[in-house]
Amino acid sequence: MAEKSYQAGVKEYRKTYWTPEYVPLDTDLLAVFKIVAQAGVPREEAAAAVAAESSTGTWTTVWTDLLTDLDYYKGRAYRIEPVPGDDNAFYAFIAYPIDLFEEGSVVNVLTSLVGNVFGFKAVRSLRLEDIRFPLAYVKTCGGPPNGIQLERDRLNKYGRPLLGCTIKPKLGLSAKNYGRAVYECLRGGLDFTKDDENINSQPFMRWQHRFEFVMEAVHKATSETGERKGHYLNVTAPTPEEMYKRAEFAKSLGAPIIMHDFLTAGFTANTGLANWCRENGMLLHIHRAMHAVLDRNPMHGIHFRVLTKCLRLSGGDHLHSGTVVGKLEGDREATIGWVDLMREPFVPENRARGIFFDQDWGAMPGVMPVASGGIHVWHMPALTAIFGDDACFQFGGGTLGHPWGNAAGAHANRVALEACVEARNQGRPVEREGREILTEAAQHSPELKIAMETWKEIKFEFDVVDKLDTGPMLRVVNA
């Protein structure tokens, strides 16, 4: 440790935390923030202020700095880049020593990186765009309880995406009618049905009753079709104790999968539930309710790719990822980027998809992306092309809104999916020839034909709010 002397007072952050000569270590946690500084604040000072407040710094010099090796523990702002197309914003790259973070704790990482610093007066807006978790830290986290391959092995389903349906209306059904809808969808050809994010235990349908009627429907559909079926039973609850109580009851009924709202319930609850699922042989479906509060503003908050990485570390076998083509926000290239971060063992830097760093996941299993929100049979070719096999396509209204009923809606989706997969396997450009592929399949499926007629005019063509930053400064790294 270098010899130091204490000098009281306030000094510029950049004198301590701006280190452009620094070369990040393999064990450093790296972060990139999009910053708009207050008028008159130099960019280096704003970047250094973020590095300080998210690591060891405070607003004034303190004598207790002499009791530790501040030069080792501090965050270091080591690079600044302009944001293409925006003269006010810039990217600040910051390196943090791994010892700043508790092992296996996404909670602790986020408390540092997006804690007090987001209320800092020196910046007008601040967004955490990406994180590089070093492999040494990844190995301290539990990750997905099962992963994609183990899920396929348990379900005995290979070579195609999985199909699901969110039961609608999301609120107001009795447990018995809810279970009836589940049964009709599963016997019609779906692999899964799902509780919506805000179904917990309301007066119109208490959780015990829902679990019992739903699992009766699941077992009946499994017996009749000879296929393994499941329903995402939402165990999100007011307290962790109640959450585990619901999970245990789901297990006692023979449920293969449960569900959790990871952002509203919190990462502590989610990591604990993921550990429980790993120990009890249960799949864990993760809903991202509340994510857009954090990630939709392109100038302030946390990008969804960061939330995706944090969820993979915390634990979950499924995660809602957006659809690109449905009713919810999602740029195509950015979506493909975070889908890769969910599934792949190694993802290289690729600025064209918004990925700022290489990310090595080691042997950690992948998370299956769930495409859900305003999709129907006409979207099936695009979904197949965008997501490939290791995904779950979830049609709520696109199943339950079929004029002939739930089973017919499920059957139409299954026929459409298998037609697209077969065409893809034959080498046909599925997205470009989607209309022809579906029309050919509909000749042998009246359910699909009616579904195509019902939703032929339904499109969600709105401009994307959170677009990738593009321009002459964009660096593209081919995967």
Curated annotation (Swiss-Prot):
Binds 1 Mg(2+) ion per subunit. Its cofactor is Mg(2+). It holds the Pfam family RuBisCO_large. Keywords: Calvin cycle, Carbon dioxide fixation, Lyase, Magnesium, Metal-binding, Monooxygenase, Oxidoreductase, Photosynthesis. Mg(2+) binds at residues 194, 196-197. Gene3D superfamilies: Ribulose bisphosphate carboxylase, large subunit, C-terminal domain, RuBisCO large subunit, N-terminal domain. It comes from the Bacteria. RuBisCO catalyzes two reactions: the carboxylation of D-ribulose 1,5-bisphosphate, the primary event in carbon dioxide fixation, as well as the oxidative fragmentation of the pentose substrate. Both reactions occur simultaneously and in competition at the same active site. GO terms for molecular function: magnesium ion binding; monooxygenase activity; ribulose-bisphosphate carboxylase activity. Its EC number is 4.1.1.39. Heterohexadecamer of 8 large chains and 8 small chains. The active site is at 168 (proton acceptor), 287 (proton acceptor). The basic functional RuBisCO is composed of a large chain homodimer in a 'head-to-tail' conformation. In form I RuBisCO this homodimer is arranged in a barrel-like tetramer with the small subunits forming a tetrameric 'cap' on each end of the 'barrel'. Belongs to the RuBisCO large chain family. Type I subfamily. This is Ribulose bisphosphate carboxylase large chain 2.
